[in-house]
Amino acid sequence: MPVQTAVVVLAAGAGTRMRSKTPKVLHTLGGRTMLAHSLYAAAEVDPTHLVTVVGHDKERVGVAVSALEAELGRPIAIAVQDEQNGTGHAVECGLSALPADFRGTVLVTAADVPLLDGRTLHALVDEHHSEPTPSAVTVLTFTAPEPRGYGRIVRLPHDGEIAEIVEEADATEEQAAITEVNAGVYAFDAEFLRSALGQLNANNAQGELYLTDVVKIAREAGAPVFAAHLADSAKVAGANDRVQLSRLAAELNRRTVENWMRAGVTVVDPSTTWIDVGVTLARDVTIHPGVQLLGTTAVGEDAVIGPDTTLTDVTVGEGASVVRTHGSESTIGAGATVGPFSYLRPGTVLGASGKLGAFVETKNADIGAHTKVPHLTYVGDATIGEYSNIGASSVFVNYDGVAKSRTVVGSHVRTGSDTMFVAPVQVGDGAYTGAGTVLRFDVPPGALAVSGGKQRNIDGWVQRNRPGTAAAEAAAAAGLHHSSDLHETEKQDLKDGIEQ
């Protein structure tokens, strides 16, 4: 019968060195909080029970745990450590959330080691069960050339087995020189752990219940103690302040980018490319410098992203090109082109082979296949059919100061530059609009819509009103002459409007 496994994630600390109103475990890197990274790794073990121990700002951390419970699709019990009395006490609180008759392996990890992955936890469990006689405790260790801040692994001189873990504050000078250190990740036999926790005391420099003392208790009881040595120490590096967090974020990103490159993605400049862990990329995607792919962004085969592009929760179809664009919660169809300097706000859907060009902003807009919005246009709360073309400097006027309304433009529509769509309004299939048209009423299919009065030219206006200027001289050279026979109404026009 397979051995049951429970995972206890410690997330109760205050994290004062972050100097933040946000709990330490809710600071983010790679698109997830540190807590989320830890729970994702724990879930990969497929434990029978998953417990998070909360304490500082427990309500806020508890809400985050509940959200992750839905995201991971598995129950996560919450145990509360009201008084921060050391790691031993925290694990004791965690065990209280398990069934009283639970038998098996208890994995203990921390919520501030975001690079720890499920494979490492699997390896720890395998090591814990590797000998015929089950281990009471298996400790994950690593070698730290600069071991400051870590508990030291003290081994027996005659056989090299672990004798105890000594916290730095309690270490002798000789023990402080040891470079093998405790990673803070353990596998315990559940029955032994319950017994050992009851034997802990606070007779130490910190006045706390150390979980590490369980190792010494096991050794004194003659119970087996194993060690699993981790070569990749970055996986268990903690983030206690923002400097450490930024370093871990950079290391996580480096690993993420390199993994995608090995999977067939071209990243022209890895040093300026940031990819969240929730992003998915198909093979033969090309990413140019200065790109951020965030959240759950997904990019299809042969798409080209960048340079200087940020996409958050955006789906990009095969063969699309997205250049110098900022987009969020949008969909870009296969073969579409976007940019440069486009802004895709939430709810934008661009169909296959469509185009959003320079200085185009879209929001809550469904734009059909092969439709082009080439430049200098705002498209908000709109539906545009296939094979249409929206002229430059057009605006979908969707807000009347109280409510937003929708514009519907059909297929094969051609609109002149500077068309204003005053919503709610509909433009039928195959319709045209003249340049500068303000659409306040529906346009039937196949119609040409124009608006505005007849153009009037007032001859000689510059010479009369701007004499001696370069414009007047240029006009004179072009053969224009002062006109003295203006109609009285034209003079009034000048007085009332044009000169103003």
From Swiss-Prot:
Keywords: Acyltransferase, Cell shape, Cell wall biogenesis/degradation, Cytoplasm, Magnesium, Metal-binding, Multifunctional enzyme, Nucleotidyltransferase, Peptidoglycan synthesis, Repeat, Transferase. It comes from the Bacteria. Pathway: Nucleotide-sugar biosynthesis; UDP-N-acetyl-alpha-D-glucosamine biosynthesis; N-acetyl-alpha-D-glucosamine 1-phosphate from alpha-D-glucosamine 6-phosphate (route II): step 2/2; Nucleotide-sugar biosynthesis; UDP-N-acetyl-alpha-D-glucosamine biosynthesis; UDP-N-acetyl-alpha-D-glucosamine from N-acetyl-alpha-D-glucosamine 1-phosphate: step 1/1; Bacterial outer membrane biogenesis; LPS lipid A biosynthesis. GO terms for biological process: cell morphogenesis; cell wall organization; lipid A biosynthetic process; peptidoglycan biosynthetic process; regulation of cell shape; UDP-N-acetylglucosamine biosynthetic process. Its EC number is 2.7.7.23, 2.3.1.157. The active site is at 375 (proton acceptor). In the N-terminal section; belongs to the N-acetylglucosamine-1-phosphate uridyltransferase family. This is Bifunctional protein GlmU. It comes from Rhodococcus jostii (strain RHA1).
